[in-house]
């Protein structure tokens, strides 16, 4: 509970931040979060009797990356890397989920996600010899090919509990393959609510994903992410998903709602990058009320979340009554700068060292 209270406190501090100086003070206090990860990964390495060379080979990462984890407490940058660590170190299911939930703030292994289903099967049947991550990759690619050949299947859609119970009953690779193919429809639909929300924001700009990415000079990996999300029900990269929300001018509440649809935890100010993103989004909405109006226009007819829908309608009623904007188009024209551009400027002012992030802004 202490950790949870601290997280809430830090999140609240960021929401009240009025300058980059105050933000930097919060960032400087985040060292314990990275210290926890450093202690955790070093304990695992010691328990498994590995050196850096063996760890980098097992986790399919460079030696420099592994050294940064163990010496500096640098966090892995995406969920796939956490999967590499879990499989490389042959963690059991409980340990694997702790790794994902506590340190990655990613969802636990989710049986209704095809990649996770493969991971769950490999964990239950770790090969006696060889590379567990390679086994996972080969089985995943084979199943993706088989699913394309098989089609959606005739099986009725299963809920998460049903699919996970039946997954655990599959003993052979052949049985597992047959189960996945027969339930291909359930796997393809696992993230459809998330894709629906993202599409609402993109369509509001009168563009498809390709046009949105092209017009805003963004990374085409967003297009690939959306394709994988819709066609294969593939779990998106957490930071990339958050940054897509930023580029779509979503509020903090909307980004966190989107994360919940991806079965992920809300944004956490204990993570330095997420802390900066939270500051940028909160400040942008505070300085420019047009962002609130824009997102309210988009979500006013969104029935999947009645609470969010009502909040958006209340915002619109407030602004129309005040007569601040004559019509919707005037509001949208007023937004000359995306929050993504604003975030990029803040990161540059803070001399953010990880250049990879700028690819997505």
How should these model regions be labeled?
Residues 79-95, 239-254:
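DNA major-groove recognition helix of helix-turn-helix/homeodomain DNA-binding modules
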Residues 51-58, 208-217, 244:
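Short alpha-helical "recognition helix" segments of helix-turn-helix
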Residues 53, 64, 94, 223-224, ...:
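Key DNA-contact positions within bacterial/archaeal DNA-binding proteins
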Residues 57-77, 102-104, 214-236, 240, ...:
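Recognition helix of helix-turn-helix/homeodomain-like DNA-binding domains
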Residues 50-51, 80, 207, 239:
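Residue-level signal for the short linker/turn that defines the boundary of a DNA-recognition helix
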Residues 6-50, 139-211:
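A short, Lys/Arg-rich alpha-helix, primarily the initiator
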Residues 25, 95-149, 254-333, 339:
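Short amphipathic recognition helices of helix-turn-helix/homeodomain-type DNA-binding modules
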């Amino acid at each position: 509970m202490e950790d949870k209270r601290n997280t809430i406190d830090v999140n609240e501090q960021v929401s009240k931040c009025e300058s980059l100086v105050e933000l930097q003070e919060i960032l400087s206090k985040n060292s314990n979060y990275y210290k926890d990860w450093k202690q955790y990964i070093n304990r695992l390495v010691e328990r498994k009797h590995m050196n850096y060379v063996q760890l980098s080979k097992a986790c399919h990462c460079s030696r420099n990356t592994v050294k940064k984890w163990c010496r500096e407490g640098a966090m892995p940058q995406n969920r796939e890397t956490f999967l590499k660590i879990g499989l490389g170190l042959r963690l059991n299911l409980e340990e694997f989920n702790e790794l994902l939930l506590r340190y990655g703030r990613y969802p636990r292994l989710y049986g209704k996600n095809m990649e996770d289903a493969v991971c769950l099967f490999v964990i239950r049947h770790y090969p006696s010899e060889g590379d567990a991550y390679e086994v996972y990759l080969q089985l995943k690619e084979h199943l993706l090919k088989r699913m394309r050949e098989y089609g959606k299947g005739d099986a009725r859609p299963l809920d998460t509990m049903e699919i996970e119970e039946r997954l655990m009953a599959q003993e052979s690779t052949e049985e597992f393959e047959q189960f996945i193919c027969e339930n291909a429809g359930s796997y393809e639909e696992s993230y459809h609510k998330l894709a629906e929300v993202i599409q609402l924001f993109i369509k509001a700009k009168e563009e498809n994903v390709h046009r949105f990415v092209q017009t805003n000079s963004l990374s085409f990996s967003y297009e690939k992410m959306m394709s994988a999300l819709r066609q294969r029900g593939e779990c998106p990269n957490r930071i990339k998903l958050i940054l897509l929300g930023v580029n779509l001018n979503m509020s903090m509440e909307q980004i966190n709602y989107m994360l919940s649809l991806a079965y992920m935890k809300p944004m956490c100010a204990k993570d330095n990058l997420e802390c900066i993103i939270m500051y940028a989004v909160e400040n942008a909405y505070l300085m420019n009320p047009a962002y609130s109006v824009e997102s309210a226009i988009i979500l006013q007819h969104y029935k999947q979340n009645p609470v969010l829908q009502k909040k958006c309608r209340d915002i619109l009623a407030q602004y129309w009554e005040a007569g601040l904007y004559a019509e919707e188009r005037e509001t949208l024209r007023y937004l000359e700068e995306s929050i993504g551009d604003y975030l990029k400027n803040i990161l540059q002012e803070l001399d953010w060292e990880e250049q990879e992030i700028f690819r997505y802004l």
